[in-house]
C-alpha cells in the first residue's frame, strides 16, 4: 500500500518531467513507464480515461508490482463519487465484482487492491473493463478502459521489475 500511495504522490508532480523518466513505452491503450525517485526505480503500467468534452483526465488505472512480487491495482476517481457505494468492475460479459474505496487525498479518491494471477489473466483475455460508480447526486457514471495492449504492457512491467 505504501508504494501505491508513494506512486500517486509523485504521479501528478513534477517528478514526471521528461528528465526523470528512465523508460517509457506505449502498448496500444496502455503506457508503461519507470521513473527514478530517491535512487529507487518505480515502474507502472497505466491507462488514462479522458472526458470527451474537456479532454481532462477523469480516471486512471495503474498496475504495479511490489517488492514482494504482488501485483497491485489502483484506480483513481474524481471526488464527486459516493464513497459509501461500491464500484462495480466488469470485464467484458463476466460477472461484475464490487470494490470499495481505499482512501482519498486532495487529488482523487482511490480503489487500491492486490490482484491475483486469475484476475490478471482476465485482464489479458479481455477486451474492455467497465466501471460503474455512483456519484454524490445519485447519478451512475460508467467509465470504460480498453484492455488492448494490456498483455504486452504487463509482460514489459514484469520484465522491468523482476528481470
Where would I find each of the regions flagged by the language model?
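A generic "folded-domain core" signal
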Residues: 17-163
